[in-house]
Amino acid sequence: LSQNKQKLAEKPMAAVAVGFGHQGGKRKTSEAVYITEEQTRTEIKDTRISVSITKTATVDSYTNAELRKKYHIDKYDLHPGYVFPESVRSLIPRNTPEYVDKGFNYVERIVRALYYFKQCALIGPSGTGKTHIVYLIAELCGLPIWEINCGLQTSAYDLFGRYIGLGKENWIDGQIVMWCRNGGILYLDEANMMKQDIASRLNPVLDTRGHIVLTEKDNEIVHRHPHGYLVISMNPFSAEFVGTKPLNAALRRRMSVWINFDYLSVGDKIFPDEVELIAKRSGIDKNTAEKIVRTGAELRRQYKNGDLPYGPSPGDLINWATLIADGCTPIEAAVETIVGTTSDDVEVQAVVKRIVESVFSSS
């Protein structure tokens, strides 16, 4: 005896989640989940009875819809009419905090570049939110993200795939090949640290050919998914970033759009929204928040001039402010946060501490 039953139902359930980002933020999202289909199957064989229930749900995040309007990306649908397979939906980011910029419309510009050209490049110093914004875009556009750090230890086998065990029976796809097959955003972080052999193998998939040849797998040709997008990010090529080198010329030509990132506040230029951000997310008063931002701006200036190895991100400043809100003095909190974050070198830490003391000793 075999019985199959299908029924349609809608059952809303509320869910609240919290996420964190490079700007130290956390965003609560209120989501409505609707059960759109329920399948029940009952089988009786001999004296055994088995029952299986399969439920399919769709999630509608009101917060994300509002953010799409806020960032002016409603008109750019990066996967029209296409639903990503269940196997990769877990790679779609959730609860990514909003991104605060200086009116440069980074989100809109990146989404527009992906919509028209399918790939773009982000360049800027550490702590300016390049990775944060890519994750935010992936969430707002409903795209799985495949992140690869292009360090010198990353091998072609990790990215394209390899056989495991003896013989040629068990092949495992690498990250890039899985992206080609499934779509989404391939995010190559620290792209100007990429090995030359890896960069050259990417060229065919980024131009009109649109495919990768797996020489390790009997020259199998894997075509790029129609909803496969590429974002590369990098720090500026300089001596401070060990391992960086000028980006491969062929790869550079295939990046249709280049977007430059910078810190919110640098030197004497203090961005009021960053002060508001620090005060709001840590709970400290605006006067203390302004001093924290001024300290961060000076550290960033010295970093950009090559005098310090790191410039603090807004998230670093919020960590500092959070300890102050908990009762630590500004100096104590700085020693536990941005002083240690900047460098392990005792002399460099002393320089950072002096900058903190000079800002907080002023009226």
Segments (PLM) and residue ranges:
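C-terminal regulatory/interaction module of P-loop NTP-utilizing enzymes
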Residues: 2-363
